[in-house]
Amino acid sequence: MFMSQIVDIRAREILDSRGNPTIEADVILESGVVGRACAPSGASTGSREALELRDGDKSRYLGKGVRTAVQNVNSSIHELLVGQSVFEQKALDEKMIAFDGTENKSKLGANATLAVSLAAAHAAAAEQKLPLFQYIANLRGQTTLTMPVPMMNILNGGAHADNTVDIQEFMIEPVGFTSFAEALRAGAEVFHSLKSVLKKQGLNTAVGDEGGFAPNLRSNEEAITVILQAIEQTGYKAGSDIMLALDCASSEFYKNGQYILEGEGNKSFTSNQFADYLAGLVKQYPIISIEDGLDESDWEGWSYLTSILGDKIQLVGDDLFVTNPKILQRGIDEKVGNSILIKYNQIGTLTETLDAIYLAKANGYTTVISHRSGETEDSTIADLAVGTAAGQIKTGSLCRSDRVSKYNQLLRIEELTKAVYRGKAEFKGLN
């Protein structure tokens, strides 16, 4: 037997940052090395995402248990992969995909396949005595490593908050800095400054799932205004040091072909009108990126949005592309969007995640590696962002250990690699 052979695979039910069960997997090698990883879980999900297998037994965890997925790892996946070399990442992932046999991994569960896929990469890296980011880089011959620009979600509306703001996330991107550590510091300072701005206005400063504030503001523009005040208060310049980014998650307020904004007095917009509304915000404020500006099925609307904003700012497809290379290819062919959000639990294996990242890069699309609203202490996405030189990472606000664990891992990686932080160079329209 060779030392890199997988001798055991074990999974267990653990809790995520929302107190819901998720799955953690261990891949154990002949050498005694153990690789471990956890699957995250989303709140606003695209309809074409790979399936997260839940038990549905209402008497346990309100139906959200993952014992079935755990059992799938401990039986089917165990049988499939024990005896294989851990260094064959693609072959391991392809075995799980073929065994599952469904388009959306509904047989094994994408949470089961992903946890094992990532745990295998952790084990392989440890076996080769390599940091995970370097192992991931080697998988696709990525020779340049870069530190990602963080897209920091500091103010929430939509499905992530109980308020009247329609846009789901208002984020800051600290682009005018020369290192990740400095960019992180700027983000943290703005986060603390925003807290004091909200406090002064008598607004709620409790934080949501991703660590962002969710005050009861009256409109989307009011949310932008308080962030700009916070940036100014810290002494940074909005538009040069720090840019704004939005995640509209507009599928959440798209009904019968109309975009209905409750926060704007139940105003309804056609696709083109809503795209024009977003273009108006871009004109008025230092916004560099808009995610899911239109509904995931509104390809015509997306096409129009891309035609008016695509050469000025980053237009990110999340629910639109769901980290799926096939769907991304359609976007490339139809010139829809210019960026993809990468959430590996939307697709269910590391190999397919890398396929999506490199397909995007080959076609001039930017890539943003992302957490989910239900996270764990697992910081694999930090290594993924550096190891693929993705350029950006979206991993929440500047509080809650489930978010900060990723930032801290990036600080360690920067210290180790001295990888370049490209800041503004990552964006169209800023160069």
Curated annotation (Swiss-Prot):
What PROSITE patterns does this protein map onto? ENOLASE (PS00164)
Gene Ontology CC, one term: cell surface
As to how many cofactors bind and how, the note says: Binds a second Mg(2+) ion via substrate during catalysis.
The record's active-site residues are 210, 343
Q: Can you tell me which residues bind (2R)-2-phosphoglycerate?
A: 168, 343, 372-373, 394
Task: Give the record's family classification.
Answer: Belongs to the enolase family.
Q: What does this protein do?
A: Catalyzes the reversible conversion of 2-phosphoglycerate (2-PG) into phosphoenolpyruvate (PEP). It is essential for the degradation of carbohydrates via glycolysis.
Q: How does it assemble?
A: Component of the RNA degradosome, a multiprotein complex involved in RNA processing and mRNA degradation.
Name of this protein: Enolase
What organism does the UniProt record list as the source? Acinetobacter baumannii (strain AYE)
Instruction: Give the encoding gene's name.
Output: eno
